Amino acid sequence: MELGKGKLLRTGLNALHQAVHPIHGLAWTDGNQVVLTDLRLHSGEVKFGDSKVIGQFECVCGLSWAPPVADDTPVLLAVQHEKHVTVWQLCPSPMESSKWLTSQTCEIRGSLPILPQGCVWHPKCAILTVLTAQDVSIFPNVHSDDSQVKADINTQGRIHCACWTQDGLRLVVAVGSSLHSYIWDSAQKTLHRCSSCLVFDVDSHVCSITATVDSQVAIATELPLDKICGLNASETFNIPPNSKDMTPYALPVIGEVRSMDKEATDSETNSEVSVSSSYLEPLDLTHIHFNQHKSEGNSLICLRKKDYLTGTGQDSSHLVLVTFKKAVTMTRKVTIPGILVPDLIAFNLKAHVVAVASNTCNIILIYSVIPSSVPNIQQIRLENTERPKGICFLTDQLLLILVGKQKLTDTTFLPSSKSDQYAISLIVREIMLEEEPSITSGESQTTYSTFSAPLNKANRKKLIESLSPDFCHQNKGLLLTVNTSSQNGRPGRTLIKEIQSPLSSICDGSIALDAEPVTQPASLPRHSSTPDHTSTLEPPRLPQRKNLQSEKETYQLSKEVEILSRNLVEMQRCLSELTNRLHNGKKSSSVYPLSQDLPYVHIIYQKPYYLGPVVEKRAVLLCDGKLRLSTVQQTFGLSLIEMLHDSHWILLSADSEGFIPLTFTATQEIIIRDGSLSRSDVFRDSFSHSPGAVSSLKVFTGLAAPSLDTTGCCNHVDGMA
């Protein structure tokens, strides 16, 4: 559904957080107007109704509904402006039942700007929490006044986000890379710090947070670019420890059991601060020493790099589940590939799935957080110019996405404002997570302790590369790595380079991620009497991955047989042509065109989905407007070829001379695919592309394909693609 154009924040925004009301529908803004759009679920489908403007302001940054408490109480809507928040109540009109009267109940002003997700309602009552970069204020009486209760934030860090737990007893505030917990006393209307879990550090800055079940929260941490850049800048130096503290560095371990009680708070916090500060402090070059080994006796200066991040999992953004009970426990931690700053997060309580996205990336990832199963992932990919500006679950299977489409701008200069103009629309995507075989409770904890070992970074890379030789050349993404040493020992590899991301599943379905263990009982059963560092256990039940591997091997074998058969057919054709020429005499050679007027066609090959959503394009020379079928077969490694004409796929054949019995025109675009594979299992339903941007071709369901009048190919022109 198209909503029109509007001015939205570039980053940090989730315009659909607490924006859907069961009666009044969706509240959204274009930057100035407050609009209500009717939203209904009918037979499992979303139906959008009429929209009406209920207010207009100079600047609106966000909207959020208070939780519905009772039928006889007015409905509250918080309107977030740049530096203040106004709370409005909606009451039914006594004159017309279809109309609603709005009136302002209170206005909250502050000296600092409100954070992009700075209005958070209590899950069970009309208590509003307002966040700035330095303050957290709770307003328990928004129906009548602006009386507030301030949280005691005794830290110098910057507040990013906050949320209430589902039980409504605890407020969790993300300050920098740490979580601060507060207990709410509803009777006294007071907020005090939790004595059993004061501060819990998660190693990286928290971008977004949401409540999951009971006293558990899910947080998304950004990629620690400051640590990686700090490491890369000093990678050739061996920096000694601080002279004041000669103890070895305390390096965090991702798979380590992370828990915090009252006694261990100070010691654990101090040990990790010493690590993070080593990447942020300026380097003292006057104390740089070099180590000289026996094998380096002839070297003048030997400087050794110290890599603290590679292999620890800190070179990626993460989704972390944190449980607050008697002690804080990190119950699970998985990587978020391809997204640098995951500032959008949403949770569905019924399906136990989390959606993670970013305002600056067109990818949305769906994770399963069920404790007894391996977390799955589903990828939702938007257009290149589209960005998710808000996400929320309507049901356990439907995800509502507010999409902002940006016009193409010059990326040479950084944007000068925090907001930009977008073409706003609403889309609904179905969540289809494949269920993994259930794991018993006795096996689940053991699974967490062993699953990260076989699926660490190196093994996962080998597994992905084994699926297809071209798998790493498919979906574009960003990979940031701090491992800058090559096999020949020369440092200096690019820190950030564009690769083809392996994050998408082979069939846009679900693949199992590596779950890094964080909580284990003290008495876990041993699978072997050998030490831990020598035991290697297989990952638990990966039928989909094994099926894909066997399917890939079968596909490669069949392709090799087809190539041999095609070569034999080509040899027979050449022998037959030579025989005919000997009997009938040489044919007069045709006049060839000038190289300046090169006649060629663009052949676009749509590959099967389990090789990745990839479109390969080649430029092929025409011979008198004709294409030789064998040339096309050899170019793309196909035995049977289907060509798209209007909305139909047509199998191509050859005449007695080996040419496709059609005439083609220069610079014509031809779309082909493998004709020997099953349509229902392998290919998408349809194919669409833009005439001016063939490089951004993608496959979509239900879109009509462009028409072609002719096709053909002969000698291949290298370098034209």
Curated annotation (Swiss-Prot):
GO biological process annotation, one example: protein complex oligomerization
Q: Which superkingdom does the taxonomy of this entry point to?
A: Eukaryota
Describe the PTM: Phosphorylated on Tyr when associated with HCK.
Q: Which residues form a coiled coil?
A: 556-584
Q: Which residues carry this modification: Phosphoserine?
A: S299, S468, S501, S523, S686, S690
Specify one Pfam family. WDCP
- State the organism named in the record: Homo sapiens
Gene giving rise to this polypeptide: WDCP
Keywords carried by this UniProt record: Acetylation, Chromosomal rearrangement, Coiled coil, Phosphoprotein, Repeat, WD repeat
Cite the GO molecular-function annotations of the record: kinase binding
Region called Interaction with HCK, residue ranges:
539-545
Q: Where is this region: Disordered?
A: 520-553
Q: Where is the composition biased (Polar residues)?
A: 520-537
InterPro entries named in the record: WDCP (IPR028041)
Give residue ranges of the WD repeats.
55-98, 154-194
| Linked pathology | A chromosomal aberration involving WDCP is found in one subject with colorectal cancer. Translocation t(2;2)(p23.3;p23.1). A 5 million base pair tandem duplication generates an in-frame WDCP-ALK gene fusion.
State what changing P454S does.
Answer: In a breast cancer sample; somatic mutation
Q: In the record, which positions carry N-acetylmethionine?
A: M1
Q: Which residues carry this modification: Phosphothreonine?
A: T530
Indicate yes or no for the key word Phosphoprotein: yes
Please give the name of this protein: WD repeat and coiled-coil-containing protein
Q: How does it assemble?
A: Oligomer. Interacts with HCK (via SH3 domain).
